[in-house]
Amino acid sequence: MEPATLITIFLSCFLVGVTGYALYTAFGQPSKELRDPFEEHED
């Protein structure tokens, strides 16, 4: 395979992985540990 193809595949997998991790952190199990600054400072 050409180096450009391998780099493209690697970058694509990396971006999909980062996006998946961000979605898991935002909506998965770890989201229960996230703090909400708006709820902390209700007036």
Swiss-Prot record:
One of its GO terms (biological process) is photosynthesis. One of its GO terms (cellular component) is chloroplast thylakoid membrane. Pfam families: PsbN. InterPro entries: PSII_PsbN. The keyword Iron does not apply. Belongs to the PsbN family. This is Protein PsbN. The lineage of its organism: Eukaryota, Viridiplantae, Streptophyta, Klebsormidiophyceae, Klebsormidiales.
